[in-house]
Amino acid sequence: MKTSGDVPESYRRSISNIDYTSPVCKINVALNKLPNFLADPNTSESPLPHHQATIHLNCEETQMIDQAYIDATAGRWSRLPMIEMVLPTSRDPTLAPPGHHVCLLFTQYAPYHLTDGVWDEQTKEQYAQLVFDSIER
């Protein structure tokens, strides 16, 4: 095993300057039914193939992701956050009561430190509502 003396100072410095803060805000949601997408409407109450994969929203164009990142680097949550949605109950229905589902949302970009405030309960609720409204569109 190497000690810090075995590693060049320039390398140690570059490693210590890496920002490991996460730009992701994860939201876990309990649903009383599967999401119904306009692009591929549900034909039954059973999961369809698109429910069984990762669903990406608000990333149809690179510019959308860039703007979300720019918002976060300015200390604001993204006005139109990129969303990765996973519905694990579409593959394993034992994770929720019959007819219900679990939805996992990985949203980007959400800065750890906000320029105009803190992540208090009200701010978290506002951000979650922004995400839900974005999904509903």
Question: What do these predicted ranges mean?
Answer:
Residues 76, 81-137:
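FAD-dependent oxidoreductase catalytic-site/capping-region signature
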Residues 1-96:
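Mid-domain catalytic core of redox enzymes
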